[in-house]
Amino acid sequence: MEEKHIETIARGVCISDGKVLLCMPKDRSYSYLPGGHIEFGETGREALVREMKEETGLDATAGELLGVVESSFVQKGERHCEINLIYEMKIESKSEVEVGQRTVQSLESWICFDWVPCDKIDSANLLPPEMKPYCHTGKN
């Protein structure tokens, strides 16, 4: 039997001009906060900064830990369990992207990023939905 494990993920809330940065798989109808898996030996903040650099080429700063969201779901017929560490996030590379004004370019072919108005977060199908409160103010 394949050993199962709980995935630990660092996610960032970047809010600018009333918009929150979200990530979307190109072949799906949902969104999630940017970030990714924490690798052994790194902190959540380090993982968030690394993932943003890998996925967008942009330098980010991970700030205050805003909260923790647990999630359990089935994807492609397989049960997944994850713990999401949610941090404040700022994008440092303002010369490359006007924060909040235009789409952040993805370096990965299967995802895209977009700035979504905080008051439209309910229509963004954010998963897990327990993350929605952080997208309005950065705080739960």
How does the language model describe each region?
Residues 17-19, 90-95, 118-120:
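Short loop segments at secondary-structure junctions
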Residues 16-54:
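Conserved Nudix-box catalytic region and its N-terminal flanking loop in Nudix hydrolases
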Residues 7, 15, 33, 60, ...:
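Short connector loops at helix/strand junctions that flank enzyme active sites
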Residues 73-99:
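Active-site-adjacent beta-strand/loop module that shapes the phosphate/pyrophosphate-binding cleft
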Residues 1-20, 88:
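Conserved N-terminal beta-strand and adjoining loop/helix that marks the start
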Residues 88, 99-135:
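NUDIX/MutT-family hydrolases
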Residues 22, 68, 86-88, 115:
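Conserved hydrophobic/aromatic beta-strand scaffold that supports enzyme active sites
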Residues 59-68:
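A short coil-to-beta-strand element that immediately follows conserved catalytic motifs
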